[in-house]
Amino acid sequence: MERMVEIERFDEEASYEVTLRPSSWDEYIGQEKIKKNLKVFIEASKRREEALDHILFFGPPGLGKTTLANIIASEMHTNIKTTAAPMIEKAGDLAALLTNIEEGDILFIDEIHRMSPAIEEILYPAMEDFRLDIIIGSGPAAQTVKIDLPRFTLIGATTRAGMLSNPLRERFGMHFRMQFYTPEELAKIVSQASHKLEKPSKAEAAHEIARRSRGTPRIALRLLKRVRDFSEVANENEVTLERARYALDELGVNDLGFDEQDIRLLELLVSAKNKPMGLSTIGAALSEDEGTIEDVLEPYLIANGYIERTARGRIATPKCYEHFKLGGITQGLFDDQ
């Protein structure tokens, strides 16, 4: 069963995310520092009548990287072509994208950390000199064909900035780290979306959904849709606090946005009694691959001070111990302390 607090997008979510996606700065909630800087850079580019410098967005999934790219295109009054690095398998794939863009257009590449080194090599001159170098043939008869490109803006998005090669990272003129959202920001997002879904949420219900959404709009919208289902079946015209609490409890999402997998991970670290635990050990104990633990389970727990990464492994923080003592979860873990 898929986790309700999964930060990656479910297959069926792509269409409704587009429906609920903000299309202007006025609608876009959160990431205020990034918005402020982007507004300046966009205005400067428009006054100079130049394409924006290349932009890199990085941070956990579901925080609005794709949405920002689309708003930038809208503000620049230009076209945007969207793809993902795994879709660009060979030089011809990249060439097809680059030769079909116009002056000032935006090319958005998601998961750019998954781009192969061979494709990166072709991308470098395109980003720096707006030139495409294509090798035709092989061996001694091989020839390099140079194709001039219109000036464009590449927007890259990644959840794993550390996996980007230095040469690729250095070719982006702007780097923006996406931050987790505050409960207040998420409550506004929930309220905004609930009106678009024609099922208004009471303010306290929006806050209840927001505080269980792990600082992530994608999760907040997913929970809202499921809470809306409970409200619909109960023949209610709006989402109430009582219905939101009931629905979220039924979905297995607790007051802090933790689900069963989070609790299992935290219990495991607490049981180690301050001894660091390696990623491979955690993976074996939870029957999860290391990538899932590192990219999906850990980010929110680390950002909120429940887990600490050390050179020797992961440990539970005092905040984590305190949560378990106060929450009444797995009291047996503390019996011999």
Swiss-Prot record:
SMART domains: AAA. It is found in: Cytoplasm. DNA binds at R309, R314. Keywords: ATP-binding, Cytoplasm, DNA damage, DNA recombination, DNA repair, DNA-binding, Hydrolase, Nucleotide-binding. The keyword Repeat does not apply. SUPFAM superfamilies: P-loop containing nucleoside triphosphate hydrolases, Winged helix' DNA-binding domain. It comes from the Bacteria. Residues 182-252 are annotated as: Small ATPAse domain (RuvB-S). One of its GO terms (biological process) is DNA repair. Transmembrane segments: none annotated. The keyword DNA damage applies. ATP binds at L20, R21, G62, K65, T66, T67, E128, D129, F130, R171, Y181, R218. CDD domains: AAA. It catalyses: ATP + H2O = ADP + phosphate + H(+). Has 3 domains, the large (RuvB-L) and small ATPase (RuvB-S) domains and the C-terminal head (RuvB-H) domain. The head domain binds DNA, while the ATPase domains jointly bind ATP, ADP or are empty depending on the state of the subunit in the translocation cycle. During a single DNA translocation step the structure of each domain remains the same, but their relative positions change. This is Holliday junction branch migration complex subunit RuvB.
